[in-house]
């Protein structure tokens, strides 16, 4: 996939994000992907954190994936945990094998902690801040990571 998601934290503590996509090849005329839909391809809450997505947009926007990542951070999960739990939740709700979803998330919280998770083998992502720059590999999720841990989802627990 050719989507680029960027999340950043300025020296003054302001969070920002952006995303760009080339779109799905051979798409249906008029298709709108997840990138321009706030909460799907990108979401920033300056009190909590920011998240961006890449992958099959339809599988991300049906669940407002980036918004969900930030909400999990609001509940206390680290950025990587929030990305992974979002993928697990989408997989549980969708019902298809997790590898068929082709979704990936990056996240950054207000404290400057970052993380990422993706389906299948995951994906590489870049991190840079003063004195550090590297390309890292995201957490990789497959069928064995879905589970049905009932009661471990702080968002779903609030809806009960």
Task: Go through the PLM ranges and name each one.
Residues 1-160:
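N-terminal nucleophile
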């Amino acid at each position: 996939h050719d989507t680029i998601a960027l999340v950043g934290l300025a020296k003054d503590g302001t969070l920002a994000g952006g995303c760009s996509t080339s779109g799905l090849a051979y798409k249906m005329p008029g298709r709108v992907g997840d990138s321009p839909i706030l909460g799907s391809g990108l979401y920033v809450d300056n009190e909590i954190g920011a998240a961006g997505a890449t992958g099959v947009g339809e599988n991300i926007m049906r669940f407002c994936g980036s918004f969900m990542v930030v909400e999990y951070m609001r509940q206390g999960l680290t950025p990587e945990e929030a990305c992974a739990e979002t993928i697990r939740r989408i997989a549980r709700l969708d019902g298809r094998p997790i590898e068929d979803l082709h979704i990936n998330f990056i996240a950054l919280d207000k404290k400057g902690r970052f993380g990422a998770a993706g389906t299948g083998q995951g994906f590489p992502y870049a991190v840079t801040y003063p004195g550090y720059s590297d390309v890292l590999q995201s957490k990789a999720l497959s069928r064995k990571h879905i589970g049905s841990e009932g009661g471990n989802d702080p968002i779903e627990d609030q809806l009960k």
